[in-house]
């Protein structure tokens, strides 16, 4: 990487493909500061995949959001033959999957809610009075919005009103990052444990930029909430879920966010060993994509985590389209290789699994006690590179684990089910996704289960409008009735 010039408002960075890269690129990145945010433009020189002649193209990243990156990579696909982003491909929903999602909320209830109702967690809070109906509360993801974690309430699960935020502006946890394009406030869940309300949530450590799980507490489900001074778990962990037993003992579920780790490990390995691109990728478009990302990597690796994901996404998609086969190919390639190569590939494979764990919470809800137990990990083809967004509910003598799999920002995302005889498992997965994208709603994800006023169980989830999936895009609140059977879950009738 060569820095050609550097001024307070503008810098040029020149990047060349490493030797032995099968599709050599030269990329010049221009960073310009405008309106307190950097804007990027690129001069890309490479081989035209149709004429096989060298050409140079100019690109301006028109927006530093998911749409802007999709536009950028769509143009690269047309000019240089990179893989077309999944969200720009012709979508074919599974014709065998039939479901009707009930639209609960399809717009923000308050202007301060910026991104809708991603990762919706619903609970019922019973009144101390025998004459008053219980109230349902729902919390959702807020990403980098000024106010974190909207709280809404309802008495019937149909009509909702805005209450406020777990963390209003300037009241976020001291340990967590709080900047646009940097902070990530995800997946809050509120649970009542005895006489107190606990909100478990994801935030990004302001020093390490790692995702962590924190907790905030209040005696009122509508707040105010006070966060603990330190997170409960650190080190790229997300999606806390709490299960409270009848005796008040609480357990915390969480997921290791290794899907944020392995892409960088793999790209770095290919940067140092570019000849393996030809061994690992079959389709030419994927070889070109890998070569492009390897060239860009010395610059991309220094970006903030979610922006790094937006750059890496098409590379990730080239792998998760046949994820289990790619994993097996890595295993085959590392055989009989020098020890450093074997160790580097094994490290990539280690992070290609995203295990979920459960562990008992302390009585004050601020720490873990005992030993953790692994619940599930991604091992089905449809799940691809991750499982996440879990919720466990008990019905009779069975425990039902609902979870999401695949890429949250594409039509490939879906919801799975695993069933156990004990809270700690072992859990047996239903082989096919329980919920998938439809023509009306994309990427159903991060479910929660609640009993409706009529006593019947309903699954609440989020979904994108078709063609509008992506990071920090609006997610609607949807629901479906469900029926529990001993070895499976079925959709009920709306």
Name these PLM-found stretches.
Residues 2, 6, 10-14, 18-37, ...:
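Carbohydrate-active catalytic/glycan-binding domains of CAZyme proteins
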């Amino acid at each position: 990487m060569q820095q050609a010039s550097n001024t307070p408002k503008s810098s040029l960075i020149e990047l060349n493909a490493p030797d032995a890269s099968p599709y050599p690129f030269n990329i010049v990145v221009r960073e310009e500061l405008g309106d307190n945010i950097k804007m990027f433009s690129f001069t890309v020189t490479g081989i035209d995949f149709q004429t096989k002649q060298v050409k140079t193209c100019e690109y301006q990243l028109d927006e530093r959001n998911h749409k802007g990156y999709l536009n950028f990579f769509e143009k690269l696909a047309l000019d240089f033959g990179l893989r077309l982003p999944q969200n720009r491909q012709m979508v074919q929903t599974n014709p065998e999957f039939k479901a009707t999602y009930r639209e609960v909320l399809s717009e923000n209830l308050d202007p301060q809610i910026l991104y809708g109702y991603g990762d919706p967690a619903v609970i019922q809070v019973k009144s101390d009075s025998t004459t008053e109906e219980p109230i349902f509360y729902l919390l959702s993801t807020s990403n980098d919005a000024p106010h974190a974690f909207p709280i809404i309430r309802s008495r019937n699960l149909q009509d909702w009103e805005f209450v406020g935020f777990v963390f209003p502006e300037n009241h976020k946890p001291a340990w967590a990052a709080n900047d646009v394009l940097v902070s990530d406030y995800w997946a809050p869940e509120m649970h009542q444990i005895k006489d107190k309300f606990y909100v478990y949530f994801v935030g990004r450590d302001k020093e390490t930029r790692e995702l962590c799980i924190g907790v905030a507490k209040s005696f009122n489900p509508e707040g105010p909430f006070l966060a603990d001074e330190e997170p409960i778990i650190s080190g790229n962990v997300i999606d806390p879920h709490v299960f409270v037993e009848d005796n008040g003992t609480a357990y915390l579920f969480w997921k290791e966010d290794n899907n944020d780790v392995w892409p960088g490990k793999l790209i770095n390995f290919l940067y140092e060993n570019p000849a393996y691109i030809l061994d690992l990728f079959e389709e030419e478009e994927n070889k070109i994509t890998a070569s492009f990302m390897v060239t860009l990597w010395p610059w991309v690796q220094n970006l903030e985590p979610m922006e790094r994901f937006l750059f890496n996404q098409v590379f990730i998609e080239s792998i998760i389209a046949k994820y289990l086969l790619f994993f097996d190919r890595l295993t085959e390639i590392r055989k009989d290789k020098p020890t450093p190569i074997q160790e580097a590939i094994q490290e990539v494979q280690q992070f290609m699994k995203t295990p979920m764990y459960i562990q008992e919470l302390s009585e004050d809800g601020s720490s873990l006690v005992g030993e953790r137990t692994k619940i599930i990990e991604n091992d089905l083809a449809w799940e691809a590179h991750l499982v996440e967004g879990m919720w466990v509910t008990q019905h009779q003598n069975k425990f039902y684990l609902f979870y999401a799999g695949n890429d949250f920002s594409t039509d490939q995302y879906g919801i799975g089910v695993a069933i156990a005889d004990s809270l700690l498992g072992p859990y047996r997965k239903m082989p096919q996704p329980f919920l998938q994208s439809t023509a009306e709603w994309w990427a159903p994800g991060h479910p929660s289960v609640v009993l409706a006023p009529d006593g019947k169980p309903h699954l609440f989830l989020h979904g994108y409008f078709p063609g509008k999936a992506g990071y920090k895009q609006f997610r609607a609140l949807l629901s479906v009735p469900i029926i529990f059977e001993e070895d499976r879950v079925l959709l009920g009738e709306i």
